[in-house]
Amino acid sequence: MSGALRAFTIGLTAFLTVVDLFATQAILPALTVSYGVTPAAMGFAVNATTIGMALGGLLVALFGRSIDQRLGILLSLAVLAVPTALLATMPSLPVFTLLRIVQGLCMSTAFALTLAYLGEHASASDPASAFAAYITGNVASNLFGRLLAAGVVDHLGLAANFWVFAALNLGGAVLVWFTVERTPPMRQTDMSHGSPFASWLGHLANPALRAAFGVGFLILFAFIGTFTYVNFVLVRPPFAVDMMMLGVVYFVFLPSVITTPLAGRAVARFGTRPVLWASFAVAIAGLPLMLSTSLAALLLGLALVAVGTFFAQATATGFVGRAATIDRGAASGLYLASYFLGGLSGSAVLGQVFDRLGWTACVVGIGIALALGALLATRLIAAGHRADAASAFQIARPSRHGGTTS
C-alpha cells in the first residue's frame, strides 16, 4: 500500500470510528423540538457519549494488552451500529441517553485500540504521519459528520439520520476487516510489574501529568460548550438558519483539518508550553466574535475556537504519551477519561448557564475554561526537552492514548 493510500485509509478509519460522536450536535435543535425538552437537557443526552468514551479509555488501559487489536476494533465498530440504529426508534430521553453512552463505549474502544495498533505497527520512519492521518480523520469527522447529519435530517428526517450513521458504522467494520492485519496482543515492552491501578496512582502523583489531565478536561469542556449551544443561537433571530445551513456552518472546522497535523512540528520547534499558550490564545481570540450579530464574525470566531482547541488537544495528548515514564497506556487512559469527563461537564454546566443566563454568559464560561487551561499549561514541564522534542502524535504508542475527539 502506498504512503498516500495508507494515510487515506488511516484517516478514513478514524472518520468512521468517531463520526457519531459530535455529528448529532448539528441536529440538536430538531431533537430538542422533537423531545420537547430544554437545550440543556437535550445537550446532556446527546453528549452522554462522553461518559462511554471515558469508560472505554479506562477499560482499554486496563485490559487492552490481552485483546486482539484487529478483533477488538472490528467488533467495536460492528456493535456500534446497534445502538445507533436503535436511536432511529426515537426512544424516551433516558433510553436515548443510555444508547449514546453505549455508542461512546464502542467508539472509545475502537479508537483506543486503533491508536495502539498504529503505535505497535507504524514503521519507525513514519509514526508521526500515521498518527497525524488518524487525528486529521478525527477532525474531519467533526466537519463532515455534522454536515451529513444536518443534510439527512433536513431531507429525510431524524430517524433516517440514525439509519445512515448505523450504515457508516458497519462500513467502518468492513474497512477494518480488509485493511487491518491480525496481530498478537499488545507487547508489554514498557510496562511496570505492578497492577494498572498502581500505575494510575503513580501517574496521578506526577504533577505534570495531573496538569495535563486538567488541560484535557478543560479543552473538551470549552469545545463542547461552544459547539453544542451555538446551534441554538444560530437557529434563532437574527441568524435563523435552517437545518441544512446549520450543517454548512460547520465548514468552520476546515481550517482545523489543515492546521492540526502541524502540531507535531510546532512542538518540536517551540516546545509544549508555548504551543499550548498560543493555541489557547487563538481560541480565546474567537470568543468576542461569537457574540457578534454578524454571521460572518460569528463563524470566524467558531473557526478560531476550533483551530485553537484541536491544536491544543494534539499537543496535550502528545505530552502525556511522552511524559509518562511507565505504563503509558494507563496514562493515556487517564487522560482520555479526564478529557471526556470534561466534555460531559461542559455540556451539563454550560447548558445550565445557557438556559438560565443566555449565550453571553455561556461564552464567558468558555473563556474561563480556556484561561484555566492556559494557566495549567505552565506546569507541563515533565521530561524536559526530551518530551518537547518528540512529535506531538506519539501519544498512541501502547508501549507508552487510548479518542477526540475532540
Residue ranges of predicted features:
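Juxtamembrane intracellular "pre-TM" segments in multi-pass secondary transporters
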Residues: 181-213
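Helix-loop-helix hairpin linking two adjacent transmembrane segments in secondary transporters
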Residues: 93, 124-126, 133-180
